[in-house]
Regions:
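ABC ATPase nucleotide-binding domains
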Residues: 134-139
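H-loop (His-switch) and adjacent beta-strand-loop-beta switch element
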Residues: 120-133
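ABC family nucleotide-binding domain
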Residues: 1-123
Length: 139
């Protein structure tokens, strides 16, 4: 999610719909709109990436990632380019997805973001040096 990787000439809806089109999924536009609703962007569905803020682009990328209802979402620095408030909104979306059964594997260098996780694994020089279950989760 670091760079969003959205198609610049496609609307938010079209960007989210793309994986469904590759899979030839029926009702792809409806499913894509539901994913945008999930991340709070249904009203911005016709906007292109250059018309969206960084946080909105990030949410479009998340909607695209979850539109196929994956069991696991891999997120590399999903809040790295965002202000604290928007980063917390993104983490709230991930927390909600996780509470519904989606496994979220998230890479971050920010302890505040890591505090949202039930479990954190810290690495140094390619090795795990800390693996802990968090008793208090930020939400």
């Amino acid at each position: 999610f670091q760079n969003f990787n959205l198609l610049p000439r496609a609307s938010a809806l079209e960007n989210v719909e793309l994986p469904l089109l590759y899979g030839r999924v029926k009702n792809s536009q409806i499913l894509a709109l539901k994913a945008l609703e999930r991340v709070g962007l249904a009203k911005r569905s016709k906007h292109r990436p250059n018309e969206l803020s960084g946080g909105e682009r990030q949410r479009v990328a998340i909607a695209r990632a979850i539109v196929n209802k994956p069991a696991i979402v891999l997120a590399d620095e999903p809040t790295g380019n965002l202000d604290t408030s928007t980063g917390n909104e993104i983490m709230s979306i991930f927390s909600s997805l996780n509470s519904e059964g989606t496994t979220i594997i998230l890479v971050t260098h920010e302890r505040a973001i890591a505090s949202f996780a039930r479990r954190t694994i810290e690495m140094k020089d390619g090795y795990i040096y800390k693996d802990k279950i968090n008793s208090e989760i930020a939400v």
